[in-house]
Amino acid sequence: MLYGAAAVNQKDSKLSVAEQLFAHAKPDDYMGNEGCADCHAETVAAFAQSPHAAYVSDPKLPLEKRGCEGCHGPGYVHRADANPQVISFTKMTPQESAAACLRCHAQTMSPTHWRRSAHSQAGLSCVSCHQIHPDVPNDLQSPLAQKADARKPAFIARKNPSTSMLKADELTLCGSCHASRVNEFRKVTHHPVPEGRMLCTDCHNAHPTKGLQLTQDSNKQMCVTCHVEKSGPFAYEHEPVAGNMGGDGCLVCHSPHGSNNPLLLNSFSRGLCGQCHVDKLSNHHPGLTCWSAGCHVAPHGSNTDPRFLAP
């Protein structure tokens, strides 16, 4: 029997390549890792040391989710067919590659959510960031993986847990695409990601379930996870902090990755407040900032004064 694209009928037309291959497989088509090692001994041995292997070696798993064949498809079909059918993650489209991973990782996100995500729409797949086989030869890696591997660590960044199976530390890996954000961490004030006290994923969700949204939560809710004292509730709330300005929240005033101004501010002058309070710039007391002069000292909110003045 032919597998893959050659075996697709009308009923199978909406299935991914991986789903088609497993849908047609019979129990006798699976041979176990030992059969794979006949040709791929080094790869099988390296994979046995990976966190992934500890899970897929569970004998309680169904055949189609066990060992090498759990990802690459039934082994006897690959060995016997004149046109060998196998799931090769470096030769599939990003959508097909992600669909193969999501057969087991559906709890991370659904295929529908993945297709709508920013990473998917940028042409990435799971193996763009995750290395399933330890020490995969460079010529078998995706172009993005080669780019990440070739890049020296941007900073002394915190190592991710080995169970994440990332190709590099988060700052280096994310920076291989988001270089402009990495450069912001070189500014005078920045969140302590380069120092290893934070990770990109402390704020960003690499597996988003809200379309193009890559932050863990709304801007305000995400920030107050750490900056609890700024969250209120206050008797008199400042509109940006209250989240009433189109969802920008804290970002109306702060630049989260890095800034050359104190306190991660977008500007350290009266012009910061003047973005919204234009009418106050010409007829107010002079001063470098509206708060350092000792007037509006509670910009996040106040329980005593609606103009956020000092008590």
What does each of the following model-derived ranges do?
Residues L2-P311:
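Short sequence/structural segments immediately N-terminal
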